[in-house]
């Protein structure tokens, strides 16, 4: 039979499971949004190659989406890579460093599970590789080597841009999987704990109602 102390412990465990589930759910939502932004940025990169008349617009759109993922103050496409390297080094020395923003920063500030930080860090590092590929594409275009730029952009051969994009999305997918698995586990554990608590909580509620009704009776007897 459960004591009040054990019921309190069970309720505290249930509250902790709710907190873990909320953290995992928030991460799944944020990282799924990050994946959509990354694919959209990749589409802007392709449009940049296919539509010479609107290249400036697509370049700015790519930068804006890159900033949503890993943001830094005052950067341009020309300075993004160096600033990413600088701020990432600062983060590695101090995880509380606040020189970067964006979806990846939010995930790094919401680390809960074993392996989650390492997986997120690998995602940021893969993002950096993909960003450097983008700069190579634009440099080739600037030199008039558009065919070579297109080949580098769309090829899945090792070392080419799409291969790096695939590795980037795989790394991001692993972080999503970690959080999704823990979310499911927390929900199942929480449901099990709640199932155990519910009969006892109902019993305590009935007892409280009974005491509320019966408690005033002795004093009222004086007025009969």
Named regions from a protein language model:
Residues 1-13, 202-224:
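Juxtamembrane interface at the cytosolic side of transmembrane helices
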Residues 4-15, 21, 25, 29:
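Interfacial "cap-and-anchor" motif at the non-cytosolic start of specific transmembrane alpha-helices
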Residues 20-122, 148-153:
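Membrane-proximal N-terminal soluble sensing/regulatory segments of transmembrane proteins
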Residues 26, 153-161, 194-198:
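Individual transmembrane alpha-helices with interfacial aromatic-anchor signatures
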Residues 101-169, 187:
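Polar/charged, Q/E/K-enriched amphipathic alpha-helical segments with strong coiled-coil propensity
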Residues 165-190:
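Juxtamembrane amphipathic/hinge helix adjacent to a transmembrane helix
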Residues 189-207:
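N-terminal membrane-entry
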């Amino acid at each position: 039979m459960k004591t009040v102390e054990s019921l309190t412990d069970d309720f505290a465990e249930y509250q902790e499971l709710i907190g873990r589930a909320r953290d995992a759910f928030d991460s799944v939502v944020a990282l799924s949004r990050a994946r959509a932004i990354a694919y959209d940025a990749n589409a802007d990169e392709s449009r940049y190659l296919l539509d010479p008349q609107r290249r400036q617009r697509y370049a700015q759109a790519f930068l804006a989406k890159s900033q949503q993922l890993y943001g830094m103050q005052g950067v341009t496409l020309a300075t993004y890579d160096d600033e990413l390297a600088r701020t990432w080094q600062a983060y590695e020395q101090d995880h509380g460093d606040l020189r970067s923003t964006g979806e990846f920063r939010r995930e790094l500030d919401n680390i809960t599970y074993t392996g989650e930080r390492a997986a997120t860090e690998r995602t940021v590092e893969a993002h950096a590789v993909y960003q450097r590929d983008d700069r190579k594409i634009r440099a080739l275009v600037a030199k008039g080597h558009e065919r070579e730029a297109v080949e580098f952009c769309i090829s899945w051969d090792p070392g080419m841009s799409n291969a790096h994009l695939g590795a980037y999305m795989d790394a991001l997918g692993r972080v999503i999987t970690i959080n999704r698995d823990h979310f499911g586990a927390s929900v199942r554990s929480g449901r099990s704990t709640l199932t155990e608590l519910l009969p006892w909580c109902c019993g305590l509620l009935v007892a409280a109602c009974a005491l509320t009704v019966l408690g005033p009776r002795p004093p009222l007897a004086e007025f009969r």
